[in-house]
């Protein structure tokens, strides 16, 4: 009887994560991650430029489009990069077989990254691999044409990835200073990808008190659109709160907000000195910034190398609704603000025309007012107190149809002068006062002048008693029409006719 002794076959069950660098920017990001010593992932580099591909620090390289580009690059034409990736589609699939998660990193706006990244994402999606895209947008000084190519490439890539993270290169100016070198600035952008990948690998490598597995990552990141990944560290007092705030506030990411996140994965990592209150403080600091209905998955792990340091990693996804809500109201507010401006400028145009005749009437009224106030100042308060109560109701109905322009002109002075009384009542009460006083005042000198003119000489007495020059002008105007049919010459003619005619006839 033969006895065979053999070691039991054990299969290592752990997720396989691949970082796929596409184009020149993607290859540089992979090289920086390899130099940083990131472990637990596989690195693959694909490029149409054979010369640039030789500088890759990984042995897994793919020459895209050998027949199409012949290793000379895509020439900043995305359609060339797309055709090159389609030519190398089988080789791309070989590197993706067996992977559970793939990070596709590229720089948008060029030829290879813009055109080939969507094809690689499509290949990964066909195999059911959790696909995350981490791409950069060009600087503003690179021109609008390159920015339009980047936007179209991002839209095409978003069709095939589960989660997309966009890093505008222009945001590097938020963290860079005068001494920041060009290489260091791009290293900051690559750090976003590095921290995001490390936050995923730490979940599966480090022992967790509150364990998180790859299934939780898939739940948070599958079919979630725009995402935000950040990692923050803190030391000293309030280190947990500082780490949480640094993880959320990443100035390099595109304009996204945690308010609209549908799913959030939070992992707090620290040394053996990490306390329960610190874990609670870090978790609450992030949950307060998220919608209460969001799916929050929390985990905590220990890392002996982080003695005195707390690290918080956040993966928030599903923020397309928040970004759209921030963009849509802007053009609406401009249209709303522009509409009243057009209406306001068109309305006051006819107003200055009626304002001119009113100025003429107002200029004529002050000439009549001194006549009213000079002889009789006392009867005015009696008219103000008694007249406006019964008269305004009747005058409102008569003045509105006949005079349409008076309420507009009288409304302006009523606001500044009359503060206690209703301006509508004041306008009605003020209008009949002046014509009534002028009416009676014009009648009185006419009666006196007509009465004294019958006897003669009374006109001179009235003119001597009047002291105001304006009253003399008023009496002169009323007396002049009566001086034209002068009766005195008629009496003289009568005397001339009576004396010679009667005397001669009687004498004869």
UniProtKB/Swiss-Prot annotation:
Record-given protein name: Cell division protein FtsZ
Q: What organism is this sequence from? A: Caulobacter vibrioides (strain NA1000 / CB15N)
**Record localization:** Cytoplasm
Q: Record's family?
A: Belongs to the FtsZ family.
- For this UniProt record, give its keywords in alphabetical order, as a comma-separated list: Cell cycle, Cell division, Cytoplasm, GTP-binding, Nucleotide-binding, Septation
Major localization class: cytoplasm
- Oligomeric form and interacting partners: Homodimer. Polymerizes to form a dynamic ring structure in a strictly GTP-dependent manner. Interacts directly with several other division proteins.
- Specify which residues bind GTP according to the UniProt entry for this protein: 24-28, 111-113, 142, 146, 190
InterPro entries attached to this UniProt entry: Cell_div_FtsZ (IPR000158), Cell_div_FtsZ_CS (IPR020805), FtsZ/CetZ (IPR045061), FtsZ_C (IPR024757), Tub_FtsZ_C (IPR008280), Tubulin/FtsZ-like_C (IPR037103), Tubulin/FtsZ_2-layer-sand-dom (IPR018316), Tubulin/FtsZ_GTPase_sf (IPR036525)
Tell me yes or no: is Manganese among this UniProt entry's keywords: no
One GO CC term on file: cell division site
Q: What does this protein do?
A: Essential cell division protein that forms a contractile ring structure (Z ring) at the future cell division site. The regulation of the ring assembly controls the timing and the location of cell division. One of the functions of the FtsZ ring is to recruit other cell division proteins to the septum to produce a new cell wall between the dividing cells. Binds GTP and shows GTPase activity.
A GO biological process this protein is involved in? protein polymerization
What Gene3D superfamilies does the database record attribute to this sequence? Tubulin/FtsZ, C-terminal domain, Tubulin/FtsZ, GTPase domain
Give the compositionally biased regions (Low complexity): 464-482
Alphabetized NCBIfam families for the sequence:
ftsZ (TIGR00065)
Q: Its Gene Ontology molecular function terms? A: GTP binding; GTPase activity
Region (Disordered) location: 342-389, 428-508
